[in-house]
């Protein structure tokens, strides 16, 4: 019998319900003759609906990116026959991908920053604290794993990651328990880590919190994949390649992402760059963009009922001047 590692990936198994789909399509204001970028293909839910609205005869084209090889296989299968090109690369390098394809400007771009249902539900990927699996958490399946971090970082560095990326109030205690546990044996699986996290919590907190490991797993995932650095760089390079009048839609799922996107959008949409203590503007600056959404768009009642993972989704839309 073939080992589980040798079983070829089946693209039809990659399930991902696109969040805020109609709102994204409206936000992009798709021109059938335009060139669009989906920086996070995932299960190609958003990508397919964008591509279906493009007219190849008029030059319409979609570039769909993902760093996850499973997502790339899925996107290629589901976008077959449509005016779409799929590239395996992190969206932080979107500019490089576009330039290699001979594309200077795009008419719109979408980033869906959520972990896909497939990644969460596939225990072997190590994202979930609900099933035992190797402690991995890598989107690209390359580089350091979560196990590498928990077994090598100092207590101080682990606590900082848990505090900064997970808002974990018991970060220091959890980091201490991790340090103690790895002295006896390496921490290699998700349930090992989940048990260690639970042991660091006061009994009252364990009773109150059904998922005491959630914040720790989020923090480690962000650290393993350098998610905030990738987002910062990706937003900059995508905005640089956006044509005047082009739209940028970003879906976030936690406050760290949303704050970064909100602040970036506000800076681009602000004309004056003078220091705040200046009584009047002397820079003569012009806004680089305008906000299409002053406040983030959230899932409606129907979508919340159909897809519980949409409950924390926030969509922000920007148009380049």
PLM segments and residue spans:
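S-adenosyl-L-methionine-dependent methyltransferase catalytic core, i.e., the SAM/SAH-binding region
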Residues: 1-321
